[in-house]
Amino acid sequence: MLNIRILVVGKIKEKYFRNALDQYLKRLSRFTKIEIIEVKDEATPEKASKSENLEILQTEGGRLLDKINNRDFVIALAIEGKLITSPDLADMIREIPLDGYSTIDFVIGGSLGLSNEIKNRANAKISFGRITLPHQLARVLLTEQIYRSFMINEGSPYHK
């Protein structure tokens, strides 16, 4: 069975995001082993300098990299990533195991995004649009899209 891990910076604080996330995680359990791995976020000063922001990105990126295994297929969610559709993601999720991978790691950054180290480690960078999303909402959106991918791949009418 395919393992999917969603690596994220920070925790979900709002109950409504948690409830939505839990609903999709429950639905996904019949298709895949899925887990969310949270790493500590760094406090970002309101008027942080470029170097302070870079240091925060590198610290958070290091925490994420520590959780990624060498044999995992890594997909970074990045605003500059390839714009994809739901069927595109479904194709990726179906095809990645055919290349010998048993684990897909989706990575969502914190308020400053992802470090270059994470982007360089990623096997693919994808984007759901050129907008900035709160990482809590991005987590729910990604989880729903992963569920939608499995439904597309089994030919379910959910996608319509």
From Swiss-Prot:
GO terms for cellular component: cytoplasm. Keywords: Cytoplasm, Methyltransferase, rRNA processing, S-adenosyl-L-methionine, Transferase. GO terms for molecular function: rRNA (pseudouridine-N3-)-methyltransferase activity. It comes from the Bacteria. InterPro entries: Alpha/beta_knot_MTases, RlmH-like, tRNA_m1G_MTases_N. S-adenosyl-L-methionine binds at residues 77, 109, 128-133. It is found in: Cytoplasm. Its EC number is 2.1.1.177. Transmembrane segments: none annotated. Signal peptide: none annotated. It catalyses: pseudouridine(1915) in 23S rRNA + S-adenosyl-L-methionine = N(3)-methylpseudouridine(1915) in 23S rRNA + S-adenosyl-L-homocysteine + H(+). PANTHER family: METHYLTRANSFERASE, RIBOSOMAL RNA LARGE SUBUNIT METHYLTRANSFERASE H. Specifically methylates the pseudouridine at position 1915 (m3Psi1915) in 23S rRNA. Belongs to the RNA methyltransferase RlmH family. Homodimer. This is Ribosomal RNA large subunit methyltransferase H. It comes from Oenococcus oeni (strain ATCC BAA-331 / PSU-1).
